[in-house]
Amino acid sequence: DEHRWFKESRKSRDNPYHDYYYWRPAQYIGKKRLPPNNWTSQFEGGAWEYDSNLDEYYLHLFAKKQPDLNMDNPKVREEVKNIMRFWLDMGVDGFREDVITYISKTPGLPSVYPKLPAANGMQHYSNRPDVHRYLAEFRRDVLSGYDCFVVGESPLTTPDIALRYVTEGENKVLDEMIAFSHMEADCFMTDFVPRPFDLKKMKRAFTTWQKKLEGKGWNALYIENHDHPRIISRYGSEQYWKESGKMLAAMYMLQRGTPFIYQGQEIGMLNIALPRIDMYKDVMTMNAVRLASKIMPAKKVLKLVHDRSRENSRTPMQWSNEANAGFSTAAPWFYVNGNYHTINVRDEDADPDSILNFYRELIRFKKNTPTALYGTYRELMPESRELYVYEREYEGKRLMVVCSFTNKLVRFELPERYDLEKAELVLANYEHNFVIANGFTTRPYELRVYLWG
């Protein structure tokens, strides 16, 4: 709401920028003022914010400081094209298009279940028919003239929805689409409604996307971003920090698709545990605190924030063991994780066995191994609640990835058609990797990657 366009849009109803956003008149029942419809925000409360100067509301599907651009207005789409050209001419490699399936709304912005005071209006703004048309317009008028990459992102995206946008051919409008389902293995819909980690649920999510997109589109692979806690603290183990950090890296990066690495992930950055709730700033965290405080004691609310806040992944990058983790000589926008003395780029760069150097090795391996790039995907042992095992196969060569998600010792055995003695161990996070009777006992959070052929 601090952008020049928006400031202009709220000056008057006939301002040229007024229709750059979804401004609608207030409704009145007697003297009672009501918003234009009953849609709720994705964060909390209603999706409309009142402006007394205009006696109108503007639409914000997320925070009130994030008014929705009216992409249904052709003038706005032309502005977006100019922005794209500006950055592409500056040399950027592409764009991550946030909640891209929300960019078109049902004409008239009708209420959902009009008799209800509030309702989720997603049916009127998610995956509307014009979304594909607008993205095709961007691709035709701008992106096709550059060597660039575009990845889309949006909640509740299924493989079938993604294929509308990423299927190879003339209807392709995005290079990849980010999925969320594998990040729901320890929660119900949102990180702030936790449940015990379910490895089978995570595996099903990965496998579904791998198989559904095979031969049709390309996967966007990730396990960390700015909207989730740190992955070692979440799906791995801080006790087995190095082992689980390496295992998680190979687990997702060796699947079929393009791996995304979030800042700090490559050095194994962990969640931050601040001593007081008022030290947190994020709007989603504060909304969760307000709701949780109604049903939970303060200590449990603080523990929930420690485990689930997005700010776990928004602490300054840990470059060295110097002040402010070497990020800046000035005070940064948020607290530095106190473990920067031991988890930082400079120290890990000098340590051949570090998580950072494992990521480098893993990237080299993926880039130089056609099976890891182009191979088909097949999950093995889908019923296991402790091991995630899958294979990739390409031109007669087979790659097998074995990942332990527990601190327990687990016996792993392969069928006779797989002979581990004839395979090359190409990646591992432990030394002394013995094979006994065509199998082995996995150590806590162990990783092994074997290659045949």
Stretches found by the model and what they are:
Residues 409-430:
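Beta-strand-rich binding/interaction modules
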Residues 4-11, 110-115, 164-171, 236-239, ...:
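Short secondary-structure boundary/capping segments
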Residues 95-97:
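Hydrophobic residues within beta-strands of alpha/beta enzymes
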Residues 123, 133-145, 149, 156, ...:
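Loop/helix patches that line or flank the sugar-binding groove of alpha-linked glycan CAZymes
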Residues 63, 172, 311, 442-444:
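A short, structural micro-pattern
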Residues 1-85, 89, 102-160, 165-167, ...:
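Acidic/aromatic-lined carbohydrate-recognition and catalytic surfaces
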Residues 120, 217-239:
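Active-site clefts of carbohydrate-active enzymes
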Residues 434-453:
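C-terminal beta-strand-rich structural cap/linker in extracellular carbohydrate-active enzymes
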